[in-house]
Amino acid sequence: MSTPFYVSPEQIMKDRAEFARKGIARGRSNVVLQYADGILFVAENTSKALHKISEVYDRIAFAAVGRYNEFENLRVAGVRLADLTGYTYDRRDVTGRTIANAYAQTLGAIFSGATEKPYEVEIVVAEVGDTPDGDSMYRLTYDGSVAEEHGYVAMGGQAEQITAQLKDRYVENLPLGEALRLAVDVLSRASDGGEPRTLTPDQLEVAALDRTRGRRAFRRFIGAQLQELLRPTS
């Protein structure tokens, strides 16, 4: 009788982590950063039907990279949790931290489980406050780990390159247009070959949580409005 093949738990977790990281690295990058009036989301995305950035609740939004069907399942679950909590208790009880913790539990359970593959996703949950000090951004990885970020966060295959550029160039309280142009510029410079590219409005998905809009803070930028924001000021 042959001896059963043995793989240590440590090796299994290592292999699952490597599998998830490779899947995420194939995705185009996203940038989330704070600006003067809120939180800006910029994704390289040529699809008009499949969103990588979405509203979750009044002042909470979601950005993701990786497998669309997997992060879309998480987005829908987050929206349902937010709606149920707001309806059962109070809208003020729905927070970005609540949504992020729920996602962390789901991702952690899937990553540790033996019956299905880990999710190939990375997520940012952001909530805009009444002031910049009240803003919050939570980054979640494939294994359910959560990190609270400040200022900016990059996800996707070129996240390290983008983060290094933002570390040198980002400043607090940028106007919306300047923040958007910075995000697009660092995305355009992040490539395997190191050569900067030209990203047109048709290749971008852009949205923001704007604290000046009241309860429904989420807004998208498309068409002429996006082109105007991308135009350099003289």
Swiss-Prot record:
Matching Gene3D superfamilies: Glutamine Phosphoribosylpyrophosphate, subunit 1, domain 1
CDD domains given in the database record: proteasome_protease_HslV
Key word Cytoplasm present: yes
GO biological process, one term: modification-dependent protein catabolic process
Pfam family, one: Proteasome
Location(s) in or outside the cell: Cytoplasm
Alphabetic keyword roster: Cytoplasm, Proteasome
Pathway: Protein degradation; proteasomal Pup-dependent pathway
Subunit description: The 20S proteasome core is composed of 14 alpha and 14 beta subunits that assemble into four stacked heptameric rings, resulting in a barrel-shaped structure. The two inner rings, each composed of seven catalytic beta subunits, are sandwiched by two outer rings, each composed of seven alpha subunits. The catalytic chamber with the active sites is on the inside of the barrel. Has a gated structure, the ends of the cylinder being occluded by the N-termini of the alpha-subunits. Is capped by the proteasome-associated ATPase, ARC.
Recorded family membership: Belongs to the peptidase T1A family.
Function: Component of the proteasome core, a large protease complex with broad specificity involved in protein degradation.
Record's protein name: Proteasome subunit alpha
Source organism (scientific name): Acidothermus cellulolyticus (strain ATCC 43068 / DSM 8971 / 11B)
